[in-house]
Amino acid sequence: PYRAGPQARQAETTEVDKMLKAGVIEPATSEWASPVVLVPKPDGSLRFCVDYRRLNAITVRDTYPLPRMDECIDSLGDAVVFSTLDCNSGYWQIPLHEADRDKTTFCSHAGTFRFLRMPFGLRNAPATFQRAIDIILSGLKWRTCLVYLDDIIIYSTSREDHFRHVDEVLTTLRDAGLSLKLKKCHFFKEAVDYLGHVIRPGRLEVAEKNTAALKEAKLPRTQTELKSF
């Protein structure tokens, strides 16, 4: 494992314990091993990540495409009511094939473990998840909902239709065994944040959080500052 201070080691151990209890990982003895990386979050806490760069370098790329964001947003043009859903730890809801689990082994200060569910950081994780969610919602996608990875938006031209559309999507997800992060779900809204934009009936705006940094940036005064602006 990479060198880490007491705070980082504690954060690492806490996350390992959490994943063990959730059935996401298990102890492992493997010829594969990737190091843990703890990435600082804006709030000062640490995000647990595994550095899979070596594994990704020898992984054959899955070319399954992600949806075009502009096409997703354009499809919402006539809608007047929206609901957004967030899959609970989305990638973890995809089980790993037994033959591939050892490849995900990571070494930490708490020992070596392998994933039983698909972890973040794998080269093909986005394509794998997108394919799975597209198959699950194939009968509803582009008709009542749009899906970009674990972000789902349900859209309708009337509140009456929206009741039915929300029920169809939630029932389909439940039948597929997928769970949602309720605190990040929003229902029956006239304006929602989706893919970095605020979606309203007949209006589209860039989300404030995506323009704040540009608005607060100081104007460059030298050639060097201009190049990095």
Locate predicted features.
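Retroelement reverse transcriptase polymerase core
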Residues: 1-229
